[in-house]
A protein has these predicted regions:
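Intrinsically disordered, low-complexity segments enriched in glycine and mixed charged residues
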Residues: 1-71
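Ligand-binding clefts of soluble mixed alpha/beta catalytic domains
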Residues: 52, 67-531
């Protein structure tokens, strides 16, 4: 079969689905299907009447922009068709069955891609469609390369009945088998409803496009029918809802082009598979002292500050790539580089809810820690945590079990793990945030660190309650006892005496200490008990 590229006269009018491939008898055969980046509105190609056996197949933009040097993806299964003749499907046999699958390179690294095409039967998933996706996942597993899914589907193809559900299950099973073995990314380029949402949910990272992507198990019409609640698709499952309320999506972008660029950037921090190290960049050692870190933490322990300024002062310039930016903002997670090497950053954010741990912050942190541990990415923890968020809402919704997820994730992680305590480290939250006792390799503290069971005021009210009750001036007595407790514990030295902290360091020397410590831990090897 000869494959010819269509040269478009008006690329500005081409849709995001507007990459066209003509199968016919003209021109020399090509060894691959070249995917060309196109954008914007629909464009149709007029076919000559005398061309034999011509099929027009629109490939979505999604798989296009990933390849190196403008070269796209080498397509597999381009001639696959569905095998159903029920409910008019016999008249809708389109080559590829609504999904493009293939492989290519990004920054010289092998990747596998599947890209659903909503213009073909609504991107609906059925037997042949699912078989193409499962094949590309199997190949990604065999060759140890990342998998990228570009989702744009209305759900199951109901004309094919139960085989559509079987196809979903085949994909889900492979997503689970690949979890922690190869990195998996899901880019939502359009609607994703019903069973279609569960494959992205099983992958490592989900990306959405504002005003274009939608994810929901049941759509607005079903919600209205069952619950009589009126809600728009955007309100129910748009990028904003999932980035701020549910936490389903890890990244949101204004358009598909910026999403593709974000995906490339994310790939630069992660390895090909669980047996490889993450990619590093050349780095020339120099003066690693960072004076900018000296004055970030306020003298008043109750005054907030932005932990992102601390992160920026420690890691290589402009390398911090935040994950889940708008969800559970009291916890910061993301990738960065330290002396050219990829690291995962987990940090409390004192500027939001004082940096407390709550349900969402705990699950957000735990998921990120487990990803980094699966793919050999060292962990840097920056700690300023006053405890867990109190209240009936938290208790009734499972702060105990959800808080334990972060504890579990750190405890089972075998990658190099270093903690820097910048200020507060109180109570159970101190234990959870990669403490020495749950396997942290190195723990540093700034002179401003306070490592204690609780804050000075609360501790004084409990320990000295009889003295305070008996005092004529209760407020003055409380202040006196609060100062007494603070003098004893509002510093890092008592913990250092016990060996819970390896060194008390000045803020400006943090970067230098971390570079040397992570270098020392490069060959760390831990074998956990077999399960």
């Amino acid at each position: 079969v000869a494959v010819a590229r269509v040269h478009l006269k008006h690329p500005s009018r081409v849709s995001r689905h507007g990459l066209h491939r003509i199968l016919g008898d003209g021109g020399p055969p090509l060894s691959r299907v070249e995917l060309v980046l196109v954008n914007l509105e629909p464009h149709k190609v007029a076919l000559g009447h005398r061309r034999r056996a011509v099929q027009l197949f629109e490939l979505p933009l999604h798989g296009v922009a990933l390849g190196d040097d403008g070269v796209g993806v080498l397509e597999m299964g381009a001639l696959v068709q569905h095998r159903s003749d029920l409910f008019g499907l016999d008249k809708q046999k389109i080559l590829g069955d609504g999904v493009v699958t293939g492989y290519g390179t990004v920054n010289g690294r092998l990747i596998y891609v599947f890209a659903q095409d909503f213009t073909v039967l609504g991107g609906s998933l059925a037997e042949a469609h699912a078989e193409k996706i499962t094949k590309v996942i199997d190949l990604a597993m065999k060759t140890g390369a990342p998998l990228i899914g570009l989702n744009d589907s209305g759900g199951a193809r109901i004309q094919e009945g139960v085989v559509s559900l079987g196809g979903y299950s085949d994909i889900f099973y492979r997503n689970v088998q690949a979890s922690g073995v190869i990195p998996q990314f899901s880019a939502m380029m359009g609607p994703c409803a019903g069973g279609a949402v569960y494959s992205p949910a099983l992958t490592d990272f989900i990306m959405m496009v504002e005003d274009t992507s939608y994810m929901f198990v049941t759509g607005p019409n079903v919600v209205k029918t069952v619950t009589h609640e009126e809600v728009t698709a955007e309100e129910l499952g748009g990028a904003s809802a999932h980035s701020t309320k549910s936490g389903v999506t890890h990244f949101t972008y204004p358009n598909e082009i910026s999403l593709i660029e974000g995906l490339k950037k994310l790939l630069s921090y992660v390895p090909q598979n669980c047996d490889e190290e993450p990619p590093s960049l050349p780095y020339e050692p120099g003066d690693e002292m960072r004076q900018v870190l000296k004055d970030i933490v306020p003298e008043n322990p109750n005054q907030p500050y932005d932990m992102k300024e601390v992160i920026a002062g420690i890691v290589d310039e402009n390398t911090f790539h935040e994950v889940h930016k708008d969800f559970a903002e009291n916890m910061i997670v993301g990738f960065a580089r330290l002396a050219g090497k990829s690291v995962g950053v987990v940090a409390n954010q004192p500027a939001y809810l004082a940096g407390v741990l709550d349900i969402h912050a705990s699950t957000k942190g735990a998921r990120f820690v487990r990803f980094c541990d699966s793919f050999n990415i060292p962990l840097l923890v920056l700690e300023d945590v006053p405890g867990f968020l109190p209240g009936t809402d938290q208790e009734w919704n499972g702060i105990i079990t959800n808080g334990a997820k972060l504890l579990y994730a750190f405890s089972e992680a075998t990658v190099p793990r270093i903690t820097v305590i910048t200020r507060k480290a109180y109570g159970g939250a101190y234990c959870v945030m990669n403490s020495k006792q749950i396997g942290a390799d190195m723990n540093f503290a700034w002179p401003t660190a306070e490592i204690a069971v609780m804050g000075a005021k609360g501790a004084a009210e409990i320990i000295f309650r009889k003295d305070i009750k008996a005092a004529e001036d209760k407020a003055a007595k409380l202040a006196e006892k609060e100062a007494e407790y603070s003098d004893a514990f509002a510093n890092p030295y008592r913990a250092a005496y016990r060996g819970y902290v390896d060194d008390v360091i000045l803020p400006e020397e943090t970067r230098d200490k971390l570079i040397k410590a992570f270098s020392m831990l490069e060959n760390k090897a831990v074998k956990l008990p077999k399960k």
